């Protein structure tokens, strides 16, 4: 992250100490707003109770629900997709210590049109030096040996995607995706997981482990606000572009001259 120019922000602001933490998979949970504000700006409905816990968001078409509850066991994120067309119902759980930047890789992808390219869950990991281990289960291990992604094939035909991280104190978090989870979403997760860029945490919120590297930085509150707002603004712009295109798009006429061409379109 580039150092912001001096004097940026309102006069008299007091800089606050933050830390850039790497690897990101050991950075701790982080600010839930990184996920929820993007969803809200993308047109998702906030169904959370007034107290704000648990967090509940529904997609605009009500086919996906995202929840976060730190008080249930084991606690964390639960994401459910209903069966639609050729897509089976699916379910994903991510522990409460999964860094929000990694959670957002998955949840942000839910707000965007699906790419026409065939997804490859392993590709982002391999591009960033994660090692593949072949065995009963295909496993890809992080360069520091503290995180992995696995396609777990159990007995009786049971299978699921499993990711986890650990420190010298034991397990840090895990994430599980049913095999019916859309592959482009799992790839979005592995892309965010393997991103080598550090993530920022305020003082007092860096996990107590010797397996992370930290860089101290001074940040103005206005800088933090501007970075957060840029993410929200991008979500609003993308949502506006999609809804604007949908509202101005000519309706299909099954009996008109474009009936055949319209049916041949590839959906993204």
Say what each PLM segment does.
Residues 1-268:
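Compositionally biased accessory segments in Actinobacterial proteins
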